[in-house]
Amino acid sequence: MASPLKTFVLRMPATGLVRSSPKASFSTISAARPASCLSRSPFRKQCFKPAISINKSFSRAVSDKPQPETVQATPQPAPSNVLPPLDWNSFFKLRVKRRRYQMLFSITNGIFAGSGGAIFLSTGSAEPIISQIPLDPFMTLGLMTLAFSGLGWLSGPSVGNQVFYILNRQWKKQMTQKEAIFFERIKRNRVDPTNSSANNPVPDFYGEKISSVAGYRSWLKDQKAFNKKKTANFV
């Protein structure tokens, strides 16, 4: 009766056995197989089977679950500093206010300029000029002091205008636009001054006395009355 080892060796094919040592006749270690053999092996799917399997129903439920929508915050518009449009009544009020500024600085500048001129003349710095004028020195000094005051008075409107626009700079652009339109209407509707006379003087040729919309309408009536009176005198 054959031994179990001999029976096992006889049953194994000769190609799958190699010598392990000179003393051992054959070894049970099989030779290395190419990688292509693994692809044909029935155990390939079991060897490379993923360790964790995801249930199909669970994955479908997760995919069908609505994703939370990301709401983008819309930027809030910055508060605009746009001023309301300037109406005509407000324009005339600002115009009257500007005229008061001009008058105030005319008076102030006239007083300060006259005082400064008097102090300057009292030092005797203008004595060579005064001696050449064929008038009484006191009268000459008085006239020169009045000249200094007049220069201060004339500079008042320019200074007052600048101060007014510094304090009301937000209305400067709109006032400039309105003023251009206003003077264009004055120029278009005013009468011809060449036809004026002592009995029929020109009514406010530059529109300086207009201080409201009602005042402008009254100014238009005065222009029409001037033209009617001119026609009546001509006939």
Curated annotation (Swiss-Prot):
Q: Where in the cell is it found?
A: Mitochondrion inner membrane
Keyword terms, alphabetized: Membrane, Mitochondrion, Mitochondrion inner membrane, Protein transport, Transit peptide, Translocation, Transmembrane, Transmembrane helix, Transport
Q: Name one GO cellular component term.
A: PAM complex, Tim23 associated import motor
**A Pfam entry, by short name:** Pam17
The UniProt annotation puts the transit peptide over 1-61
Membrane-spanning residues where? 103-123, 133-153
* Record carries keyword Transit peptide: yes
Q: Report how it sits in the membrane.
A: Multi-pass membrane protein
Q: Which InterPro entries match?
A: Pam17
GO term, biological process aspect, one: protein import into mitochondrial matrix
Role noted for this protein: Component of the PAM complex, a complex required for the translocation of transit peptide-containing proteins from the inner membrane into the mitochondrial matrix in an ATP-dependent manner.
Q: How does it associate, per the subunit comment?
A: Component of the PAM complex, at least composed of mtHsp70 (SSC1), MGE1, TIM44, PAM16, PAM17 and PAM18.
Q: Which family does it belong to?
A: Belongs to the PAM17 family.
Identify this protein by name: Presequence translocated-associated motor subunit PAM17, mitochondrial
